[in-house]
Amino acid sequence: MKIQIPDYIQVLIDLLNKNGYSAYVVGGAIRNAFLELPIHDYDLTTDATPKEMLQVFSNYRVFQTGIQHGTITVLSNKQPVEITTFRSENIYEDHRHPSGVSFSKSIEEDCKRRDFTINALCYNNSEGLIDFFGGINDLQHKIIRCIGNPHERIDEDALRILRALRFAGRLSFTIEEKTATAIHKQKDLLHYISEERIHNEWVGILETNALPSILSEYSDVIQIFIPELTNSSIQYTLNAIIRSPLDANIRMAILLKDIPNGKEILERLKYSGAEQTVILSCIKHSTKSLTSKIELKQFLSKLNIPFDIYHTYRYAIDTDYPRYNMLAYYHEIQDASEPYLLKHLAIDGNTIKGIGYQGKEIANILHACLDEVIHHPENNDAKILIDMIKRTD
């Protein structure tokens, strides 16, 4: 198998080789090359120690942020490239981090510490593809399999539970039986993982095509960090999930739609304020009656998220929602620049203040004007609105 390595990566491998060290592209880049998927970054592994790497790349800009673990980042053609010394890891004391790392001269030893067979593939142009653990066979058969004993791999790093689900979902792979058994049996180890890490992996899982099957087959795992999601509530949402796009916020809103403490769950899982706004706004308006263009404009005046997000969410949860009519109305409103927000009005608070109103009166009049132009957009004219205000004075 021949893999095309970019010049900015090959030059780093060549420089290490020139100085007597071996070097390989490792991990996700090789996996994605085999699957003909986009490659977003290239990671290198080498038998050079961090000190030796600093000497080799003395003419490059180097960041030493991970040097205590054997990793440096080299800027090559303005692209950051992580290069890590072959290593083995000591005992894991917290089901997440090794107590220490030991540098190695063995590429096989380095690959042995990785999570899944499909992520332990190495390549360089001189030696070709190196596959110690059957990763290519697992890629061909679409299998996620832990390297070695899956119970040991998960005990070392419990985040591998969610990584397995994410890879299986993203690639539409099946989790191998022994690995799946270990995931179910050791799911409680997720309590050792920070909410931030869980959040990041969970978002990745939500954005996969295989989310419905993951929710069905691994509900017990998901209930470790979202215990409020009962088996029945998950099953109830599956059809909506199937209709939804691969959008993490929309899918989280679907899952939490009928759960009363959604905001607490989102805060517990370290969702950002922006994410919470989208999710909670969708949930809040789940049953909003929308049958006409005027109703849609009134709704848009209160909606604090993009309409296309709400529109997609609403159709996913409600097949009776008149999505084609609402989409047509929405485009009519936008194409004609029909007003539905206070900022769309031809007048503002200063205009009303100039007529003689103060305080809350100004806000009340602005909203009355907005209601007028929502029903009669042709009246969104400063003179017409001022005359209307004076007539009601």
Regions found by a protein language model. Give the residues of each.
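Catalytic cores of the polymerase beta-like nucleotidyltransferase superfamily
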Residues: M1-D393
